[in-house]
Amino acid sequence: MKESPLITLVKRHSETHFANIKYGYYVLIISLVYLIGLALLRAFGRRTPSRSSSAFKNKIIYRLYDIDPAIHLGILFFAVLIPFYYHYSLTTQSTVYLKRLGRLSYALIPLNLFLTLRPNWFLRKNCTYTDFIPFHKWFSRIITVIGLLHGIFFIIKWAIDDNVSLKQKLILKTFNFVGFIISILVLFLLICSIGPMRRYNYRLFYIVHNLVNVAFILLTPIHSRPGVKFPFLLLNCTLLFIHIINRIVFAKSLMILNKNANYSKTNLVHVRLPRAILPDYFEPGSHIRISPYRRINPLYWLLPSHPYTIASLAEDNSIDLIIKETSTAEPGSQIESLRSNPKSFHLDQEKTYTLINSYPPSVPEECYSQGTNIAIICGGSGISFALPLFRHFFNKENVKYLKMIWLIKNYSEYELVLDYLKTNGLTFEKKLSNNKRISVFISGEYTAETRLDEITTNIDDENSEYEMGSFNNEDEDLSISNFNSENADSNDNTPETSHSPTKENGSLIEVKSKHSFTLSSELKSFNNESAQVNQNETWLFSCGPPSLLQLSKKYCNDERINFVCETYGL
């Protein structure tokens, strides 16, 4: 009798095929631990610079509390990469690590989607989505690069292997071809996200960003082996669904009640909206997001919405916006340009808009309740953030010192805000004291007429999806260097002037034209008062162009004062 031949069964997959499943779960657990740690940091952490600690220690504490991308991403990826290289040989089993890169990029997406929820109910009390803007920007780039490297390294591996056909591996195998398509889409997204490209056409970047993200989430489970359908695809689709629901449930239609604009003098405009569009209470300095399209319009989902800081308080009869609309017009044709320029966005009375939602400012709760020594510094359209804060603290009897400094380029901007105060009957005389004041610094000539050559050409707001306010190139030109005495003398022969131009608020508002501006001298009384009160009672707010924010931040670090800022640029 003949013996049967020995049959050997060969495993379909090598022993390394499932090597990365546990690593994906590990990344998910680290993401959860990071979220819990972030919630605890914001709930019990200290952002206040200690007067007894070193400047370096205070800086690290502030950056940690402020969700600085370098600090937080460093901590996150340190934890994620600890077990990345483990057990398998990098030379003989390199495929394990190439696949691990792909799983890492997909496993990090739930955390990124969660942190960009608006509103984020888990972190709502101590965070606002604007706190995560810088983190989200860099986190998204890293995830994208990791995913792209996964594809590039596999192509290189197959190309240099004589025993493998690149065409057969990359094109003829459906799973790998889907991955190749994902890599092309990701590469296109990275090109569109480069600074000059993004600024040149932000709308294109925004559309590509959203479509590629959705494609990455839905196509990767087709490409991935072993699969990532559970729990990663389920989590990602759930979070995407919540994003969509938030843009539907909280949205409502609105129309402009009134618009005060004089484009021949300034691009700063005052827009009035119905009070009913917002809840009975919202924090001073909150903002709204507006889309020119209705929810049923595909462009509502494809194009970015526009953020505007609310210049009014909750007790006012209307919702007021003080914004800058952009123009590329020649003198005499400002309105026509605003209507025709595809790179500008303006609010028009005859149109219906969609209010997506309102959002709180990135201001700690203890600031509103405990602040008694307050300084507010703003530039240009940053007045929309500064003015409601000033009014809030002005109405508090326990405030010992309050000063707002507004830096602008021409007098017409001040006229518009003054008209807004008069129209709304906002006078401060009844509660006026020597320790409460507004100082307006004008770098241009003190006249009621604005030179048309001061109206600069603008590009689409690169941060319209991410940032507050109506920051544009005009505010960016509002550099601190425009307010030094040397620059003032060189502009023309206009002497330095200082006076109070209004009867209603004459003792409160002081307008200074062609004055040199030194932050330390303007805040001398504020700094003296800070030494007399508890540290959590002294706060400095800043809003405007980068040069102003940097100056304010440095001042607070040097003097160890609580600092809150709203950025009008990336």
Swiss-Prot record:
Highest rank taxon of the organism: Eukaryota
Signal peptide positions (record): none
Entry-linked PANTHER family: METALLOREDUCTASE AIM14-RELATED, NADPH OXIDASE
Membership in a protein family: Belongs to the ferric reductase (FRE) family. AIM14 subfamily.
Record EC number: 1.16.1.-
Record-linked InterPro entries: FAD-bd_8, Fe3_Rdtase_TM_dom, Fe_red_NAD-bd_6, FNR_nucleotide-bd, RBOH/FRE
Ferric oxidoreductase domain boundaries: 101-219
Keywords linked to the UniProt accession: Electron transport, FAD, Flavoprotein, Ion transport, Membrane, NADP, Oxidoreductase, Transmembrane, Transmembrane helix, Transport
Gene Ontology molecular function: ferric-chelate reductase activity
Broad class of where this protein is predominantly found: membrane
Protein name: Probable metalloreductase AIM14
Coiled-coil regions listed in the entry: none
Region of interest (Disordered), ranges: 481-507
Keyword Electron transport attributed: yes
TM region positions: 21-41, 70-90, 101-118, 142-162, 177-197, 204-224, 230-250
Reported function: Probable cell surface metalloreductase. May be involved in iron or copper homeostasis.
